[in-house]
Amino acid sequence: MLLSKFGSLAHICSPASMDHLPVKILPPVKVEKEPFDKVYQVGSVLGSGGFGTVYAGSRTADGLPVAVKHVVKERVTEWGTIGGVMVPLEIVLLKKVGSGFRGVIKLLDWYERPDGFLIVMERPELVKDLFDFITEKGALDEDTARGFFRQVLEAVRHCYGCGVVHRDIKDENLLVDLRTGELKLIDFGSGALLKDTVYTDFDGTRVYSPPEWIRYHRYHGRSATVWSLGVLLYDMVCGDIPFEQDEEILRGRLYFRRRISPECQQLIKWCLSLRPSDRPTLEQIFDHQWMHKSEVVKSEDCDIRLRTLDTDVSSTSSSNESL
């Protein structure tokens, strides 16, 4: 009997009978983000530059090491949007590249403040930037350089796939994990969305910039990146950058101050071709014969000492961290 009564009411609740009823759409519930000061603790300065200051920090909940970059609004020249909010383009680029790939720094969070933005990123421990790493060694042997260089190429390829060009590839923007030898590309403050047309602005490091920028203040993203990769590879195997002055960049003459294999020299010279159209593509660099030479390194000659998980961490507690 009860079931039959429910059945008799079905016409009242049917969709057709409800067409004339007003429908009230509730606005989505906005979840407020916890204040930065409650989520993170900030410590000492890791570094500073034209785009802001980077601090060491940690996440309060679990002690996760983080790097916090404070970017002043007045210094931001390139902007983008996330969820309809205007943010520095650097945050947009980090969001694009920072997931699913270990070779670039990962964005964890960001906050807007009245005077600027706080960009929260992962902070790898037991790392050293490649500049300091090379300085300590004097220069890298070709096997170590090859392994590092391939990782940089993979990071660049990943960025391209995400529609991003870094525009400031250099030794100071690469972190070396001292336990594994893994490299991580950092600092997208000079980056841009990748495009096939010319760029007429450049905020990267001048000694890594291509001759077409020095002479014409114009360049294409991919060919300019290849030039900076040539400078970086020279830096790895020779211990210093090839050019210091604008005139040297425009002349493009190379002097190899150390004994370098002909294959490595040829790849560097190719990347540092004065005409952008003469430079290799990223895939041509991957396919170059020097990139495929034997990578067997004797343990006594290895620059990176691999550590197993059960290694006594206390023996390596001091680290030179850089972001």
From Swiss-Prot:
ATP binds at L46, G47, S48, G49, G50, F51, G52, T53, V54, K69. It catalyses: L-seryl-[protein] + ATP = O-phospho-L-seryl-[protein] + ADP + H(+); L-threonyl-[protein] + ATP = O-phospho-L-threonyl-[protein] + ADP + H(+). The lineage of its organism: Eukaryota, Metazoa, Chordata, Craniata, Vertebrata. Its EC number is 2.7.11.1. InterPro entries: Kinase-like_dom_sf, PIM1/2/3, PIM_Ser/Thr_kinase, Prot_kinase_dom, Protein_kinase_ATP_BS, Ser/Thr_kinase_AS. Proto-oncogene with serine/threonine kinase activity that can prevent apoptosis and promote cell survival and protein translation. GO terms for biological process: negative regulation of apoptotic process; regulation of mitotic cell cycle. GO terms for cellular component: cytoplasm. Belongs to the protein kinase superfamily. CAMK Ser/Thr protein kinase family. PIM subfamily. This is Serine/threonine-protein kinase pim-3. GO terms for molecular function: ATP binding; protein serine kinase activity; protein serine/threonine kinase activity. The active site is at D168 (proton acceptor). It comes from Coturnix japonica (Japanese quail). Its main location: cytoplasm. It comes from the Eukaryota. Keywords: ATP-binding, Cytoplasm, Kinase, Nucleotide-binding, Phosphoprotein, Serine/threonine-protein kinase, Transferase. Residues 40-291 form the Protein kinase domain. It is found in: Cytoplasm.
